[in-house]
């Protein structure tokens, strides 16, 4: 099964092509340019350089959130655009699960976390065994104190991954809870992780049409929160 995967949920952008568990190629960019300017040229160049075509892809996958509202709003429509012409099935992947797949080989409990600001993280916890993941919690936004309580209750060391991993590390180590960061090349979001998540979804019959694919924000954007607050003040 060939999968083309897009990752734009944070400051970096990446595109990967895989065949089953095997990574065929990946392009990663952290240049400061906007994802809207870099993503589609990256995808086109990756396919050209590998001698593959979009028609030859079986699945189009994308990190659908949580993450940067702007980034997710770029990635999901881009994936739809790739999928629609050939009516390709799509995998709207949890950004957190995709990151956890990057350390599934480590084993034990994994905490995938992204900085949600205001002393909160988007996070989910998984258990890795024999290269496979079992989800322990849903994706959610929560405070670091609440997450620390949950980890303490588990009683097990945590492998930390994601751009919020350093925040979680400080919170856990401050309470004497054992944890370890993934190395830099596996710490942040990658399209390869998205492709691994998509493969799991495909094998479990969880693919959707391009029309049905939607972002998963888990929280209102700042602009939406400010608008809601203003509407509440006006209604008083």
What residues fall within each predicted segment?
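Glycine-rich phosphate-binding/hydrolytic loop that grips phosphoryl groups
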Residues: 184-217
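N-terminal beta-alpha supersecondary unit
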Residues: 1-66, 188
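Surface "functional belts" at beta-alpha junctions
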Residues: 22, 34, 89-189, 217, ...
């Amino acid at each position: 099964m060939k999968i083309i995967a897009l990752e734009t949920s944070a400051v970096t952008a990446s595109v990967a092509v895989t065949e089953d568990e095997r990574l065929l190629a990946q392009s990663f960019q952290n240049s400061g340019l906007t994802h809207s300017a870099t993503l589609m040229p990256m995808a086109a160049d990756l396919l050209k350089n590998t001698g593959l075509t979009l028609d030859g892809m079986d699945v189009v996958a994308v990190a659908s959130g949580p993450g940067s509202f702007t980034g997710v709003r770029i990635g999901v429509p881009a994936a739809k655009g790739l999928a629609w012409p050939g009516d390709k099935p799509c995998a709207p992947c949890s950004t957190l699960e995709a990151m956890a797949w990057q350390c599934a080989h480590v084993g034990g409990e994994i905490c995938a976390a992204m900085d949600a600001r205001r002393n909160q993280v988007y996070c989910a916890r998984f258990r890795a065994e024999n290269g496979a993941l079992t989800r322990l919690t849903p994706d959610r936004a929560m405070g670091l104190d609440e997450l620390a309580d949950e980890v303490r209750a588990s009683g097990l060391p945590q492998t930390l991954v994601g751009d919020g991993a350093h925040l979680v590390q400080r919170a856990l180590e401050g309470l004497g809870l054992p944890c370890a960061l993934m190395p830099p090349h596996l710490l942040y979001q990658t399209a390869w992780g998205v492709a691994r998540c998509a493969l799991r979804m495909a094998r479990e019959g969880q693919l959707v049409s391009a029309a049905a694919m939607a972002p998963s924000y888990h929280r209102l954007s700042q602009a939406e929160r400010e608008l809601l607050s203003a509407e509440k003040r006006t209604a008083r």
